[in-house]
């Protein structure tokens, strides 16, 4: 698809008018929900994403082959974890010499210290653990430090966010910086903020992490997704998370 057609598709968004963006205030995807869906997200009993959080809590307390569980170090239900530190992810690991997402840190810690069966990044149980741990920082402001050693990865993620993808030939920022609140191919667009992830998606009927959501977007643009946990997705997560700085964590958010 050529660029004239892809531009026409974007301008077909309901009421589309190009306007300058980033520099605008960060707005959570929560703001684009109906009042009924906001109420559902806010109610722990009604929020379907809480099932994934509860599954993660069970895994957190399950001992591995050496008899240790995540709770052995981090307290019952993660009581010893610092919500402010959770809100700083992704962070740069001096030991690994690369950025580490929250899910990657959980898997690294679990695989090294509990002697449980190793989990892959794309494993459903890895997503459940991430949802549980991030839920512990509910209401904490996202606070990713994109300076210092993360700066190069922030810039790499920004370049990817501004790269045109696939046969549809559209970049992430074209939808999420310019057309938030409008629809594209029947999909309500938001700013693409990360503060609600992992989120429950009504269109999928399941909880997805940020990288899973990026893969869905690339597939919709007829582009080849990267593997979950890849350098490209990690750089994108660094950029998108820093872009959400100041927004309160809502995990598990509800999104369309």
What positions do the PLM features span?
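N-terminal, post-signal-peptide region of Sec/Tat-exported proteins
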Residues: 44-76
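Extended intrinsically disordered, low-complexity coil regions enriched in Ser, Thr, Gly, Ala
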Residues: 67-71, 79-81, 185-188, 254-255
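The canonical Cys-X-X-Cys-His
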Residues: 65-78, 129, 157, 167-179, ...
């Amino acid at each position: 698809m050529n660029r004239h057609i892809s531009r026409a598709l974007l301008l077909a968004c309901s009421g589309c008018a190009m306007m300058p963006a980033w520099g605008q205030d960060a707005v959570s995807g929560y703001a684009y929900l109906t009042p009924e869906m906001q109420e559902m997200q806010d109610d722990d009993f009604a929020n379907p994403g809480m099932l994934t959080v509860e599954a993660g809590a069970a895994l957190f307390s399950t001992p591995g082959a050496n008899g240790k569980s995540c709770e052995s170090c981090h307290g019952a239900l993660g009581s010893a974890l610092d919500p402010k530190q959770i809100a700083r992810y992704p962070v740069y690991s001096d030991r690994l010499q690369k950025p580490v997402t929250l899910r990657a840190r959980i898997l690294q810690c679990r695989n090294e210290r509990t002697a449980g069966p190793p989990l892959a990044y794309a494993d459903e149980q890895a997503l459940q653990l991430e949802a549980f741990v991030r839920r512990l920082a509910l209401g904490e402001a996202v606070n990713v430090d994109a300076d210092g050693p993360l700066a190069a990865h922030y810039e790499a993620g920004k370049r990817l966010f501004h790269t045109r993808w696939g046969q549809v030939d559209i970049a992430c920022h074209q939808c999420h910086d310019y057309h938030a609140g409008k629809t594209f191919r029947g999909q309500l667009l938001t700013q693409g903020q990360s503060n609600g992830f992992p989120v429950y998606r009504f269109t999928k009927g399941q909880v997805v992490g940020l990288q899973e959501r990026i893969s869905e977007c690339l597939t919709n643009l007829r582009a080849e997704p990267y593997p979950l946990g890849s350098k490209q997705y990690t750089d994108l997560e660094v950029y998108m998370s820093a872009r959400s700085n100041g927004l309160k964590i809502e995990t598990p958010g509800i999104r369309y």
